[in-house]
Amino acid sequence: MLILGFDTTSSLGGAALYRDLEPLDEVRADGSTNYSVQLFEMTDRLLARAGLKLAEVDLFAVATGPGSFTGIRVGLAAAQGWARALGRPVRGVSVLEAMVADARPPGSIAVPLLNAHRGEFYLGVFRSSPQDAAGATPGPVWTPSTEGLALGPVRIEALARELADEAGAEVAFIVREHDEAARDLRDHIPEAAQWITVPGFHAGAVARVAFEAAREGRVHRPDELDAYYIRRSDAELNWQE
């Protein structure tokens, strides 16, 4: 299966081309969030280097957020347009899920953290289950046990202590290396918990997570794709600007 995965949720986004779980190539964004032009240039360059055409893509995988509201909308529109035009399925992947896929934590609970600004942080609580019986997925399967949250440091510290009391060193908190605000939360996390830093480029993880979902039939029609803003009120305000 040929998967085109892309992440337009931040200035560290980009696109990646995978054959099943094998990376073929990737292109990184230029540091801006002008994805209305940049995404299509990156995709053209990626496919040209691989000697492939867009029509050969079997699955479109897109990061659905949280992140830049404009970037998210551009990515979703592109995925929907390509999937609809070519009659292909699409899979949305949250940035939080992609962070867990990039971190590959060894424990049983993973908590990715993102700076949401306004004194809050986006996070999710993911729990692992054993590899599927067919052995198609390397390592454990991670599934969210809560909806995405936007919490301040005090509430994050309370949640961290609750999870550490439950699972100790089996808990891993995941932050992106460029996210200084999230990294500063380290003092609020119990010492027993693990602390994992990942890069901010997630296009490859988006493609891998989408492939694993597609193997289980968990793909979307273009009209089913939706953004993962978490803080919906912010999204609505930005949409009106």
Model region roles, listed by residue range:
Residues 36, 40, 79, 96, ...:
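A general structural signal for well-ordered alpha-helical segments in protein cores
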Residues 48, 52, 190, 212-219, ...:
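Generic secondary-structure signature for well-ordered alpha-helical cores
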Residues 67, 82, 173, 207, ...:
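A residue-level signal for conserved active-site and pocket-lining positions in enzyme catalytic cores
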